[in-house]
Amino acid sequence: MIFIGDDWAEAHHDIHVMDDNGTRLASRRLPEGLSGIRGFHDVVATHAPDPDQVVIGIETDRGLWVDALTAAGYQVYAVNPLAVARYRDRHHVSGAKSDAGDAKLLADLVRTDRHNHRPIAGDSSAVEAIKVLARGHQNLIWTRNRHTNALRSALREYYPGALAAFDDLADRDALAILGRAPTPIDAARLSVSKIRSALKAAGRQRNLDSRALEIQAALRAEQLAAAPAVAAAFGATTRATVAIIAELNHQIADLETELATHFETHPDADIYRSLPGLGVILGARVLGEFGDDPNRYTTAKSRKNYAGTSPLTVASGKKRAVLARHVRNRRLYDAIDQWAFCAITRSPGARAYYDQHRAAGDLHHQALRAVGNRLVGILHGCLRHHTAYDEQTAWSHRQNTPTADAA
């Protein structure tokens, strides 16, 4: 068996090959891309003709290079960069660092400590596609939120009437009116009929007349005014920001359609959607982040640990503390937090479990985290046994005093 450390960069890879005893067999720098992968395979073939006898350590689990390594049949371990940095300090504390040295470090790590790390999951291409779409969809939502916050901040500087007229600046009503009247002077010229026409063109069908009157009253109310030149400049930036948010709304809707199509064709989609609080979009996010490799999570605890919902115990001497995990998959944790919130409004068992934790003194987010932790365990059981969610089975034995789940 041979062990290879791969210290990757954007344009090249430094690799170090060693045997079971830690003896160096080869080391070199390979270019990124097809020629580099060919060189990698040539080095491997010289020392280990069987791909099963090749163990690789690398500080990423994504990209075409990693895909090529796993497709070749090598055992690939994605090691957290923080773990690599701590491992470096284990051998020397001088602070010295080099790409070639890090490659050797990674090879040593998977040679001696790979039992403490997980190999890259063997997820299907279908779930990888779902993850890409779900992350892209979420990225666009985060981008829209940033632009909406910037718009709100700008309107506070010169156009407070717009903030009084619209609670949600990313809503179609707000975008339609602000696109036509990006300054208070423009707003003063808007008649009720023009506002009504803009709302109708944006897609509103109900309460057109009453809503148009409300908007006109808010926009024409007396307010502090900026200098005309400043207001005009702000108006130009508002018009541009409104156009960006409107386009983001269209792209988010298109990605939702694409994501729903991919999710609904996945073999596990019915199981995910059977759980309370998981719809198409949220279910797709959770599925994409967990993956569909049936061997990745051997127990419910390992799935909970990866999700970051299970408590973390810190004990030393007579001291013992149970804390929340902060090193976690942020996207997955956020999705489970939303899932738990939705579940307590749809599942009597989840609601009762939440109420138990609140009654025991937990804060809202602590109780919500406990519900999310329990839901992850339920999901694991459903996937393991290939069965849909059942309310009675899931919660009948949990109507007791909460434990450290909410830490």
Feature map (PLM): residue ranges:
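A detector of single, family-specific signature residues
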Residues: 1-407
